[in-house]
């Protein structure tokens, strides 16, 4: 072996396979220059199978013979086409718009609901506009039922609210007529505050714009002046419409004490005024004056009762009239309920018992309505006023 290696010239390769081994994959493929027919196809398939990389995505069986390759080529192409059709879904065709039908489409069974928020808002706005036009014309429109159990019948609610407001206005009107005795209150009574006004009115309706105190006044007043002059000047400076109340204050406590209270009121108003008990608004100058009057230790409780006796009496009459009005409304409702009841002919006992109880209740209501007016409260029985917000005078 050594001789053979020594006899070899430089650059000459050995013919034995032991010296150098060549991998089958490293050997170049030797193809004939001219190929024809089956030999060319067989060589092409061998080359493709040898050079094809290993793929785990799709596994294709190797083809052994040319006959099987020709017979299976059509089946393989059909299989690939079927798989490709499964992977790609064609886009749905748009449906033509149908005029004369509602824009809301019924939900498709098994389909996903489209979250079209602004479309739903626009649709509700259009329905509200249509319902408003129908309400103006005296017709009732349809309500959107897309929210199912959360649907709010706003048309019915609006109608019921309107009827309730009209019923409340009628009751207030009847109460005002009863309290005024069927007469319209004159302007003089309104200025003096002697007219019977309905209770629980808004503050702006009762007071209007808050008056500002006139600090200078028209002229100077002293303790030697007449009570009429002092009361008139105090009412002017306080912008108080209830002049008779100020006149009673001056008559009971005297000119000197009334002027001192006026000076204290001016000082409080210049420092910002006083709030009422709940703190929702400031007192009027007249309210500050009367609040200082009730909180002055030198003025006795008997004097305060004498000053506010008429106001307490009016408040009592107003409450009494309101209570009587509520009783009348309750009696009317009871009569309507009795008329709407249907008793069974066999149940005579329950019918007689109910009828006797109802007649007694209605008789008591009629007696309370037909009874004479009660005597006015005496000075000892007058309602005591602990706070200024108990009266409707500020």
UniProtKB/Swiss-Prot annotation:
Keywords: Acetylation, Cytoplasm, Nucleus, Phosphoprotein, Protein transport, RNA-binding, Transport
Modified residues (Phosphoserine): 14, 16, 65-66, 69, 73, 226, 356, 368
Modified residue annotations for Phosphothreonine: 296
Chain location of the short sequence motif Nuclear localization signal per the record: 81-84, 198-201
GO MF term list: mRNA cap binding complex binding; RNA binding; toxic substance binding
GO CC annotations on file: Cajal body; cytosol; neuronal cell body; nucleoplasm; nucleus; ribonucleoprotein complex
Acidic residues compositional bias, start-end: 1-18
Annotated region described as Necessary for interaction with CBP80, given as residue ranges: 2-329
Necessary for poly U RNA-binding and snRNA export: annotated span: 279-287
Residues bearing PTM N-acetylalanine: 2
Pfam families on file: PHAX_RNA-bd
Residue ranges with Basic and acidic residues bias: 183-193
Motif (Nuclear export signal): 130-139
Protein family: Belongs to the PHAX family.
Assembly description: Found in a U snRNA export complex with PHAX/RNUXA, NCBP1/CBP80, NCBP2/CBP20, RAN, XPO1 and m7G-capped RNA. Part of a precomplex with PHAX/RNUXA, NCBP1/CBP80, NCBP2/CBP20 and m7G-capped RNA. Interacts with NCBP1/CBP80. Found in a complex with snoRNA. Interacts with NCBP2/CBP20. Interacts with DDX39A; this interaction stimulates PHAX RNA binding activity.
Function, as annotated: A phosphoprotein adapter involved in the XPO1-mediated U snRNA export from the nucleus. Bridge components required for U snRNA export, the cap binding complex (CBC)-bound snRNA on the one hand and the GTPase Ran in its active GTP-bound form together with the export receptor XPO1 on the other. Its phosphorylation in the nucleus is required for U snRNA export complex assembly and export, while its dephosphorylation in the cytoplasm causes export complex disassembly. It is recycled back to the nucleus via the importin alpha/beta heterodimeric import receptor.
Protein name, as recorded: Phosphorylated adapter RNA export protein
The organism of origin for this protein: Homo sapiens
Gene of this entry: PHAX
């Amino acid at each position: 072996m050594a001789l053979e290696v020594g006899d070899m010239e430089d650059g000459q390769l050995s013919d034995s396979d032991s010296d150098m081994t060549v991998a089958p994959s490293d050997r170049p493929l030797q193809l004939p220059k001219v190929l024809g027919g089956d030999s060319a196809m067989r060589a092409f398939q061998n080359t493709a199978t040898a050079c094809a990389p290993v793929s785990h995505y799709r596994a294709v069986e190797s083809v052994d013979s040319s006959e099987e390759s020709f017979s299976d080529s059509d089946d393989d192409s059909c299989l690939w086409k079927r798989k490709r059709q499964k992977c790609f879904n064609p886009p749905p065709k748009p449906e033509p718009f149908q005029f004369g039908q509602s824009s809301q489409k019924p939900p498709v069974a098994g389909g996903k609901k489209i979250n079209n928020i602004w479309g739903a808002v626009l649709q509700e706005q259009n329905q509200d506009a249509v319902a408003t036009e129908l309400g103006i014309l005296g017709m009732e429109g349809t309500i959107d039922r897309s929210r199912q159990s959360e649907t709010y019948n706003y048309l019915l609610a609006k109608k019921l609210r309107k009827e309730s407001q009209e019923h409340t206005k009628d009751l207030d009107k009847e109460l005002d007529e009863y309290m005024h005795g069927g007469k319209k209150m004159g302007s003089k009574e309104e200025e003096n505050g002697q007219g019977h006004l309905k209770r629980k009115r808004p503050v702006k309706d009762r007071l209007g714009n808050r008056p500002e105190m006139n600090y200078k006044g028209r002229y100077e007043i002293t303790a030697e002046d007449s009570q009429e002059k002092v009361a008139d000047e105090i009412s002017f400076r306080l912008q108080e419409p209830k002049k008779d109340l100020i006149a009673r204050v001056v008559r009971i406590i005297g000119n000197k004490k009334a002027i001192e209270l006026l000076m204290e009121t001016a000082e409080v108003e210049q420092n910002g005024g006083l709030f009422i008990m709940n703190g929702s608004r400031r007192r009027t100058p007249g309210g500050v004056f009367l609040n200082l009057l009730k909180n002055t230790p030198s003025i006795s409780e008997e004097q305060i009762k004498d000053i506010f006796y008429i106001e307490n009496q009016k408040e009592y009459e107003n409450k009494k009239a309101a209570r009587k009005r509520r009783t009348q409304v309750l009696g009317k409702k009871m009569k309507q309920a009795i008329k709407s009841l249907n008793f069974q002919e066999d149940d005579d006992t329950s019918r007689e018992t109910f009828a006797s109880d109802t007649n007694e209740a209605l008789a008591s209501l009629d007696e309370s309505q037909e009874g004479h007016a009660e005597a006015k409260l005496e000075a000892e029985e007058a309602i005591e006023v602990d706070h200024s917000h108990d009266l409707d005078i500020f």
